[in-house]
Amino acid sequence: MRFAWLASVLLVVGGILDAATPPRSKKQFINPNGVPKPTGYTQVVTSGPGQMIFLSGQGGAAPDGTMPEDFATQARNTFENIGRCLAVANARFEDIVKINYYVTDMAYTAELRRIRAQYLNQAAPPASTLVQTALGQGLRLEVEVIAIVPE
């Protein structure tokens, strides 16, 4: 009888403690089609409530993985890759709340702004531009993005 009473108390207390624990945010890790497959990381992670989307650094590789030599083509490919990554999380460019640019030469920033304006045509989100002398082989630009999609 004592055992049954103790077991009942433990079940009730366990249920109360379990009910008081807030649910963990739901995370989903995604590697979208049309974006080069990564090794050792994921291209996109989403998290809720109010879906937060974190993109790994996107570069200028074409969907087949080839790397163009010129900066303008790399920049366009980079923003196309960002668009594909956002789309798998039901997000768009206007959902971006933070963006970080890594370039191998500050001389590229004028061209970057011109191409960026074709994709980010709303109020510009907070951004950082950093010179990074050692990106991946042949890479002249890498862009990290955080976006939020309301529930």
Describe each region flagged by the PLM.
Residues 3-80, 84-97, 103-151:
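N-terminal presequence-like segments and the immediate start of the first folded domain
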